[in-house]
Regions:
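N-terminal, membrane-interfacial amphipathic/helix-forming hydrophobic leader that caps
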Residues: 1-128, 154, 272-311
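Transmembrane helix-loop-helix hairpins at the membrane interface
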Residues: 14, 20-24, 35-37, 59-62, ...
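Helix-boundary and loop/linker segments of multi-pass membrane transporters
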Residues: 40-44, 87-89, 130-134, 168-177, ...
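Residue-level signature of transmembrane alpha-helical entry/exit and packing/kink sites
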Residues: 47-54, 94-102, 138, 142, ...
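Generic structural microfeature
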Residues: 99, 123-125, 138, 200, ...
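Generic alpha-helical secondary structure signal
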Residues: 123, 137-138, 165, 177
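Interfacial segments of alpha-helical transmembrane regions
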Residues: 130-148
Length: 311
């Protein structure tokens, strides 16, 4: 029902004129789900300064928690604090403790991101970030894309050659370190990274500078922070750059964060499963050449295990 008149008067009681919108009641009716069009994932209520602040603090949290955990471990062992550098490099348990310290660092990062995105609880966290599928994406399409990225990465590494990286040495330092790496790479890292890079950072940069600039900056930032742990393996760095590009383009195309998270989760999760199963697969895989039957599993394990991405 649309009210065309500019006003109505109840003559019997002398009611003063009450103005109504000429376009109709539907224009002043709030959305049924309570959502406001004022903000969206591409028009966020936070700016670049807040986004960069959360990004910087994510590194501060990692540094502080790692330092606290390592010092606590050294005090427990009654070790010389002056030799902390040497102990951390050579003690497998110290390496495990350093990896484990990233769990509270990730938790603190999410808390800070929540404060920025929600305005301290005034807005819904996930919905403000765009936590739904968007155009053309489902769980299985996202998972299939993750598998395709893994295969593409395997091809890149095969062509460029595999060089031992810092993360390789970390995973190989102990079984505990390998399992902790697999846990973080699956349970916390995909969610934290997507919230920070494709959620908080991308949204703020896109609003301020446009989609193209936002894509370029986020792709490069995400890839750049992984270079130290994968240097000097250019194949792995290239794979991470490809992953970063695809995830950011998905965010730009759909305006949503959930597909990025699922691709990231499956990409890391498959490699984490291989890390967990690696000791058992080594026992069942015969030491044969790649051309013989059954050897491909061994080749894939050896190809993927050293290159799981953690942060």
């Amino acid at each position: 029902l649309t009210v065309a008149a500019a006003s109505l008067t109840l003559a019997c009681v002398g009611t003063p004129e009450i103005p109504f919108p000429e376009s109709g009641f539907e224009d002043v009716t709030p959305p049924a789900d309570g959502r406001s069009d004022e903000f969206s994932p591409d028009n966020p209520p936070w700016g670049i300064l807040g986004a960069v602040g959360v990004w910087v603090m994510s590194f501060v949290f990692m540094f502080v928690t790692q330092l606290a955990f390592i010092i606590g471990y050294l005090l427990y062992r009654h070790a010389d604090l002056a030799a902390v550098g040497e102990i951390v490099m050579k003690d497998p348990m110290a390496i495990f403790v350093a990896i484990l310290s990233l769990v509270p660092a990730h938790q603190l990062t999410i808390v800070l991101a929540w404060m920025l995105v929600t305005g301290n609880g005034k807005r819904p966290f996930l919905r403000t970030l765009g936590w739904d599928w968007g155009r053309g994406f489902t769980f299985w399409r996202s998972a299939g894309l993750a598998v395709a990225l893994l295969l593409a990465g395997a091809g890149i590494i095969k062509l460029t050659g595999s060089t031992e990286t810092e993360l390789d040495r970390l995973i190989e330092s102990s079984r505990a370190a390998a399992l902790a790496t697999a846990f973080l790479a699956t349970v916390t890292a995909p969610f934290v990274e997507e919230v920070i890079y494709r959620g908080v950072l991308y949204s703020a940069i896109r609003r301020a500078a446009g989609r193209g600039v936002a894509v370029a900056i986020v792709v490069l930032l995400f890839a750049a922070i992984h270079v130290p742990q994968y240097w000097p393996s250019f194949g792995v760095i290239g794979t991470i750059l490809l992953l970063s590009l695809v995830l950011t383009l998905i965010r730009a195309h759909t305006g949503r964060l959930l597909p990025c998270f699922i691709v990231h989760l499956v990409f890391n999760g498959i490699q984490s499963v291989l890390i967990v199963l690696n000791p058992y697969l080594e026992h069942v895989s015969p030491p044969t050449t790649p051309t013989e039957p059954g050897a491909m599993l061994h080749v894939l394990v050896q190809l993927f295990i050293p290159h799981v991405r953690l942060f």
